[in-house]
Swiss-Prot record:
Key words, A-Z: Activator, DNA-binding, Transcription, Transcription regulation
Self-association and partners: Homodimer.
SUPFAM superfamilies: Homeodomain-like
Organism domain of life: Bacteria
Alphabetized PANTHER family for the sequence: DNA-BINDING PROTEIN FIS
Family, as annotated: Belongs to the transcriptional regulatory Fis family.
Species assigned in the record: Pasteurella multocida (strain Pm70)
Gene Ontology biological-process entries: positive regulation of DNA-templated transcription
Gene3D superfamilies: Homeodomain-like (1.10.10.60)
Keyword DNA-binding: yes
A Pfam short name: HTH_8
Protein name: DNA-binding protein Fis
Transmembrane feature ranges: none
Length: 99
């Protein structure tokens, strides 16, 4: 029997309250998409610069914070978990005032 492959990103969900006051989970990517839709709709034709960096910082900072908590501050484990080298992790932690 073949086992169905799970996409690890499917576990990244956000709990939301629907119109019937029920809590449901939706993929993180849907929440990011909605946040961007809201942001872009408020621009009213204005040009925007560095949107990529803005969005990345909004996701990267809390991700680093949670991974460092999960690994109890072990940078080697955190870097492995994130799939980056330890030097890169240290730079990112410094960037966000976390290291």
């Amino acid at each position: 029997m073949l086992e169905q492959q799970r996409n690890p990103a499917d576990a990244l969900t956000v709990s939301v309250l629907n119109s019937q006051s029920q809590v449901t989970n939706k993929p993180l990517r849907d929440s990011v998409k909605q946040a961007l839709r809201n942001y872009l709709s408020q621009l009213d034709g204005q040009d925007v610069n560095e949107l990529y960096e803005l969005v990345l910082a909004e996701v990267e900072h809390p991700m680093l914070d949670m991974v460092m908590q999960y690994t109890r501050g072990n940078q080697t484990r955190a870097a492995t978990m994130l799939g980056i080298n330890r030097g890169t992790l240290r730079k990112k932690l410094k960037k966000y005032g976390m290291g």
